Swiss-Prot record:
<feature type="active site" description="Nucleophile or proton acceptor">
    <location>
        <position position="63"/>
    </location>
</feature>
<dbReference type="GO" id="GO:0061522">
    <property type="term" value="F:1,4-dihydroxy-2-naphthoyl-CoA thioesterase activity"/>
</dbReference>
<keyword id="KW-0378">Hydrolase</keyword>
<dbReference type="GO" id="GO:0005829">
    <property type="term" value="C:cytosol"/>
</dbReference>
<dbReference type="InterPro" id="IPR029069">
    <property type="entry name" value="HotDog_dom_sf"/>
</dbReference>
<dbReference type="GO" id="GO:0009239">
    <property type="term" value="P:enterobactin biosynthetic process"/>
</dbReference>
<comment type="subunit">
    <text>Homotetramer. Dimer of dimers. Interacts specifically with the aryl carrier protein (ArCP) domain of EntB.</text>
</comment>
<comment type="function">
    <text>Required for optimal enterobactin synthesis. Acts as a proofreading enzyme that prevents EntB misacylation by hydrolyzing the thioester bound existing between EntB and wrongly charged molecules.</text>
</comment>
<keyword id="KW-0963">Cytoplasm</keyword>
<dbReference type="Pfam" id="PF03061">
    <property type="entry name" value="4HBT"/>
</dbReference>
<dbReference type="InterPro" id="IPR003736">
    <property type="entry name" value="PAAI_dom"/>
</dbReference>
<dbReference type="InterPro" id="IPR006683">
    <property type="entry name" value="Thioestr_dom"/>
</dbReference>
<dbReference type="InterPro" id="IPR026576">
    <property type="entry name" value="Thioesterase_EntH"/>
</dbReference>
<protein>
    <recommendedName>
        <fullName>Proofreading thioesterase EntH</fullName>
        <ecNumber>3.1.2.-</ecNumber>
    </recommendedName>
</protein>
<comment type="pathway">
    <text>Siderophore biosynthesis; enterobactin biosynthesis.</text>
</comment>
<comment type="similarity">
    <text>Belongs to the thioesterase PaaI family.</text>
</comment>
Length: 137
């Protein structure tokens, strides 16, 4: 297991109370040895005007996952902040849920890189994101 902080899924989800994460309906669903996953509904909260998943909602899911994964790689007195987010949208989603899968690309002392892939309910890749974070403290 790569994580330096040991949180349960319930504890991870509690960090979202009264935030944009909760408003978008993002829920952490899996904490594995080197992976963090979350689901987000595709509904009126996450649609763009044409009834499709908003690209910004996919980006918010990605940054949520990468930032929390980055935080779990820090020690007491440290935090992470996002420095760069790149998102490539591959296919539209109009309903159901999407699942984000976050894994590390680079884990340095001062910066981290995370890949977050967003899948639809059929397991098709909808969006590929890369998040860079800086470790502070």
């Amino acid at each position: 297991m790569i994580w330096k902080r040991h949180l349960t899924l319930d504890e991870l989800n509690a960090t979202s109370d009264n935030t944009m994460v909760a408003h978008l309906g993002i829920v952490y669903t899996l904490l594995g040895d080197d992976v963090l996953e979350a689901e987000m509904p595709v509904d009126t909260r996450t649609h763009q005007p044409f009834g499709l998943l908003h690209g910004g909602a996919s980006a918010a899911l990605a940054e949520t996952l990468g930032s929390m994964a980055g935080f779990m790689m820090t020690r007491d007195g440290q935090c992470v902040v996002g420095t760069e987010l790149n998102a490539t949208h591959h296919r539209p989603v109009s309903e159901g849920k999407v699942r984000g899968v976050c894994q590390p690309l680079h884990l340095g002392r001062q910066n981290q890189s995370w890949e977050i892939v967003v899948f639809d309910e059929q397991g098709r890749r909808c969006c590929t994101c890369r998040l860079g974070t800086a470790v502070l403290g």
